């Protein structure tokens, strides 16, 4: 309970006040936090070029999973998360050496370090490196190093055991995850990622990208063909490749079953000469039957006249 003037001399209130004062004293101790790279500089040109290029990519891109209206470029998300977690070399040095004036050698070192970190970002944002473990691990190493530096700077903080655990990286939570670019890239960079959203479509997208695949990471496919093949050659089920193989297998099975049951409702169309007159691109296919990509359905009503 809260203490009032009437019972302010009770032993409980004395203890309660001491607890409050102790908690206030602990939280009043400042956390030493070097500026992050994103607060100082980023290779924006490289990030912008990669983000623009990404718009034309379809195969293997999360945008093909389901439509989302405000997707953020994965390249930009990856670069921003990296920049938010990695310490700026200059400010780190100033935190480690308070009151000392830097010399020319120090400044030269900072310039070289920033250039090195920029190179990591420039490699990181390339679409071709999205699954390149060498590039991703180089970024993860820098993130872990910065966390270790922050833990060392705050090792004497009263709450260091809880706030600065060397063995537990900070997690990332995107409260309005939308298309899932931020939590997906955080997960790719080795962080424990959490996503939430008010829109059920966004929730489903994020479940399909960051919640379900990790549960099956490194596990083999379980469909019948995979079990048969496993006895001959044991495949290497890296990441969620086993889950992906199952999705492909059972997706094809569902398509084949649908073809058997309702395929007659969607017949192939015979390309005629008349059709080719309006569509010259169909001329090579005159006399053949082609699969229709889209059907337009319309209700028909018998005319009363």
Name what the model sees in each region.
Residues 1-305:
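S-adenosyl-L-methionine-dependent nucleic acid methyltransferase catalytic domains
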């Amino acid at each position: 309970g809260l203490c009032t003037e009437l019972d302010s001399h009770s032993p409980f209130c004395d203890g309660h006040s001491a607890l409050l004062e102790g908690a206030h004293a602990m939280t009043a101790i400042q956390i030493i936090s070097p500026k992050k790279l994103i607060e100082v500089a980023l290779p924006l040109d490289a990030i912008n070029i990669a983000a623009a290029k990404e718009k034309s990519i379809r195969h293997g891109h999360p945008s093909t999973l389901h439509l989302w209206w405000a997707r953020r470029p994965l390249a930009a998300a990856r670069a921003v998360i990296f920049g938010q977690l990695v310490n700026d070399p200059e400010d780190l040095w100033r935190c480690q050496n308070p009151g000392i004036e830097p010399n020319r050698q120090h400044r030269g070192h900072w310039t070289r370090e920033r250039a090195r970190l920029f190179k990591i970002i420039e490699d990181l944002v390339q679409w071709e490196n999205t699954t390149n473990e060498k590039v991703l691990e180089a970024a993860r190493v820098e993130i872990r190093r910065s966390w270790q530096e922050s833990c060392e700077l705050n090792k004497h903080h009263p709450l260091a055991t809880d706030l600065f655990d060397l063995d537990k990286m900070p997690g990332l939570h995107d409260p309005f995850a939308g298309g899932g670019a931020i939590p997906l890239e955080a997960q790719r960079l080795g962080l424990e990622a959490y996503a939430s959203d008010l829109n059920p479509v966004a929730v489903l997208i994020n479940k399909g990208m960051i919640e379900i695949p990790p549960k099956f990471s490194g596990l083999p496919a379980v469909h019948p063909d995979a079990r048969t093949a496993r006895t001959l050659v044991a495949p290497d089920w890296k990441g969620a490749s086993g889950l992906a193989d199952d999705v492909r297998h059972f997706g094809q099975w569902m398509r084949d079953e649908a073809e058997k049951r309702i395929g007659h409702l969607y017949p192939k169309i015979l390309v005629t000469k008349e059709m080719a007159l309006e569509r010259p691109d169909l001329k090579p296919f005159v006399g053949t039957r082609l699969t229709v990509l889209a059907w337009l359905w319309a209700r028909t009503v018998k005319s009363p006249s």
